[in-house]
């Protein structure tokens, strides 16, 4: 994951902190402030910031729409509080941020763990969801190889990607909490149970499922998710892994914006 878009995307953004369930949640709003269309909410990956997950995509995504990007609990500019990281809580925090901003309905683009949060939002608060983009995410533990899950039992902060460490240390209000953030992120994945096929079938929002052909998420699993979702489209990106999917491929944000802009059948 690279940071090349981080400076450019902040030039004309509205920035602030929102009081959300005991957090002071950092957010930015990009794009035309008076745009009456449905805003897009970006849900970043684990151990990341919205810049590391979406920095290279955000300028294109923000053309013609408002884009809300934020750092969730204990990530980036949002300080941690004394509670674990859970997908349910992250979903509640995202919806509370929208309520704080006076937004009743939005599109959601979740990458990796952000995709898991998007799934939880669609299940817990379907009324706030117009469309979903779920990128490099899984709905149960069959979505990745056993070795992936086993790796969390002996994860060390030394194994954390350097770009993610540097991004955290650059902006975190309490940089010394990096080891705690890493430990909480590992625990969240150790506790991951996912959702049943019946729950995935109950998501009726139009959904674009995106995965790389060399992703941590098995492409076959993405196909299964696509088949379960009642109103889904599927994109399997060639020669793409879990990290390179965040690189500035011009056709990725174009594919996403085309999906969001096309009227749902």
What are the residue ranges of the model-derived segments?
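Short beta-strand/loop motif that positions the catalytic acidic residue
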Residues: 203, 209-211
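Flexible "cap/lid" loop of the alpha/beta hydrolase fold
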Residues: 116-124, 130-164
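Catalytic active-site module of serine/aspartate enzymes centered on a nucleophile-bearing elbow/loop
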Residues: 238-265
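Conserved alpha/beta-hydrolase "acid-adjacent" motif
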Residues: 216-221
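Conserved HGGG/HGGXW glycine-rich cap/lid loop of the alpha/beta-hydrolase fold
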Residues: 23-77
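Catalytic histidine neighborhood in serine/cysteine hydrolases
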Residues: 222, 228-243
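Active-site nucleophile elbow and catalytic-triad environment of alpha/beta-hydrolase enzymes
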Residues: 183-199
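Active-site loop/oxyanion-hole signature of alpha/beta-hydrolase fold enzymes
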Residues: 55, 62, 69-109
């Amino acid at each position: 994951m690279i940071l090349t878009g981080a400076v450019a995307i902040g030039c004309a953004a509205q920035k602030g902190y929102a009081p959300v369930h005991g957090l002071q949640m950092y957010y930015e709003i990009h794009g035309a402030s008076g745009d009456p269309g449905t805003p897009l909410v970006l849900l970043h990956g684990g151990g990341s910031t919205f810049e590391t997950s979406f920095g290279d995509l955000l300028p294109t995504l923000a053309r013609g729409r408002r884009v809300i990007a934020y750092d969730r609990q204990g990530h980036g500019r949002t300080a941690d509080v004394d509670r674990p990281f859970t997908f349910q809580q992250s979903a509640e925090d995202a919806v509370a941020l929208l309520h704080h901003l006076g937004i009743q309905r939005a599109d959601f683009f979740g990458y990796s763990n952000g995709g898991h949060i998007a799934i939880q939002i669609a299940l817990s608060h379907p009324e706030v969801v117009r469309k979903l983009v779920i990128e490099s995410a899984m709905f149960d533990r069959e979505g990745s190889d056993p070795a992936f899950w086993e790796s969390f039992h002996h994860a060390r902060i030394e194994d954390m990607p350097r770009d993610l460490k540097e991004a955290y240390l650059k902006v975190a209000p309490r940089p010394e909490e990096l080891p705690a953030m890493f430990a909480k992120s590992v625990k969240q994945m150790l506790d991951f149970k996912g959702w049943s096929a019946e729950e995935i079938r109950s998501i009726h929002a139009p959904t674009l499922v995106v995965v790389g052909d060399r992703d941590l998420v098995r492409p076959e699993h993405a196909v299964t998710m696509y088949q379960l979702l009642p109103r889904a489209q599927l994109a399997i990106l060639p020669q793409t892994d879990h990290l390179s999917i965040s690189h500035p491929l011009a056709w990725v944000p174009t594919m996403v914006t085309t999906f969001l802009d096309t009227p749902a059948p």
